[in-house]
Regions:
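Basic- and aromatic-enriched surface patches that contact anionic nucleotides/nucleic acids
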Residues: 2-41, 50-243, 308, 315-320, ...
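C-terminal hydrophobic structural anchor segments
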Residues: 275-326
Length: 367
């Protein structure tokens, strides 16, 4: 079993092209030129949500770096554009430029004493209230360029733009971006289900800090609801499921199915169900997402009551299937392909059926 904080995941193949009709590729942006004074006013009035949105990275700039930004404002040095996303309620979230925005607000609220200035050295050690009235006005009147991606934009194009702007030293994982764009009751439920003891035991207990656990839960819910209708790209499929259900929590029945599925998988495989077997016969360190699809969905549609007494046979058949060349293709490369998605779930379900475990798996097109 893995230790806390050590869970790792195999990533999908190279990013897939978006499947958005030409006429629907709508991206609406609105540029604004705001003074620093207007910026702080918007933060105070919660027009701009700062450091209160779960996806946003922590404030990591030290005082010296923040001070140099303030010095740039005073010297009229150009400041890079800041990008925001507009929510349905009209509020803005910082997508790119959080460190800059937060540093400016800190200074105007006397939460930053300048240090390490190389040009305006006489201001070192001073807070905003301690600099001259002239310098205060220079800072407050300095204009910043904001670009807002409005709520009118097509959600998949919007997601793609966020990925392009995702240029930090450690880029946001796909579900960290979803956590920003699709905040609501459904997203909250994903977090709750990812903490379920049954799920933690099924995947090996390791807690992933990049929200990949929540993405695994999302995969289950989205595919369980519409496996036969699945089509790639998988990122877009998951995005659409979150967008459509943003303000709705999954039904108690679906949550119960998820919990029961993970309980049975955990008890049978002891945290190794979603890991392929390496050449030396040991389970891989990484969680294989394609194998997760096959195992979790097959169990979800199976008659779990028929499993009792067959646990060892299931483990043996599972290991044999992992050596099957066709199944290896289904969980190997290009795993988001519709045929391979359906193929791996169908083949695993057939394995369970061969052990007299009935299944209600919906019809899956061959191609």
């Amino acid at each position: 079993m893995e230790q806390e904080g050590q869970n790792t995941f195999e990533f999908e193949d190279n990013p897939e092209p978006l499947d958005v009709a030409a006429g629907e590729r709508k991206l609406v942006t609105q540029p604004y030129d705001y003074s620093v004074d207007q910026l702080t006013s918007h933060v105070d009035k919660r027009k701009i949500l700062l450091m209160e949105v779960p996806y946003q990275r922590e404030y990591v700039w030290d005082d010296a770096k923040a001070s140099r930004l303030v010095e740039s404002l005073l010297l009229n040095v150009p400041i890079p554009v800041c990008y925001f996303a507009e929510n349905e309620d009209g509020t803005w979230e910082v997508i790119d430029g959080l460190q800059r925005v937060h540093s400016i607000v800190r200074f105007l609220k006397d939460d930053l004493a300048l240090r390490g200035l190389s040009v305006l050295t006489e201001l070192n050690g001073k807070q905003f209230s301690e600099i001259s009235a002239r310098d205060q006005r220079r800072v407050e009147s300095r204009t910043l360029r904001f670009v807002v991606i409005t709520d009118e934009s097509h959600p998949d194009i919007k997601f793609d733009v966020f990925e392009r702007l995702n240029t930090g030293a450690v880029k946001l994982a796909p579900h960290e971006l979803r956590n920003c764009i699709y905040r609501g009751a459904f997203n909250d439920t994903l977090k709750d289900l990812a903490q379920m003891d049954s799920f933690r035991r099924a995947i090996g207990r390791g807690k992933d800090s990049r929200m990949r656990d929540e993405e695994m839960v999302l995969r289950f819910l989205a595919l369980h609801e519409n496996l036969s209708g699945y089509k790639p790209p998988v990122t877009q499929f998951l995005n659409e499921h979150m967008r459509r259900n943003r303000q709705r929590r999954p039904s108690q029945e679906v949550v119960a199915i998820f919990d029961a599925t993970m309980q049975h998988i955990a008890s049978i495989f002891d945290g190794r169900a979603f890991r392929i077997i390496q050449e030396e016969g040991k389970p891989a360190t990484n969680v294989n997402r394609a194998l997760y699809d096959a195992v979790s969905l097959s169990f979800a549609f199976a008659d779990l009551g028929s499993i009792t007494g067959k646990e060892s046979r299931i483990r043996e058949a599972h290991h044999e299937l992992l050596s099957d060349s066709t199944f290896q293709v289904f969980i190997g490369r290009a795993t988001a392909d519709r045929t391979r998605m359906h193929g791996r779930v169908r083949k695993y379900s057939e394995m369970l059926k061969s052990l007299d475990i009935p299944s209600s798996l919906p019809h899956l097109p061959e191609a």
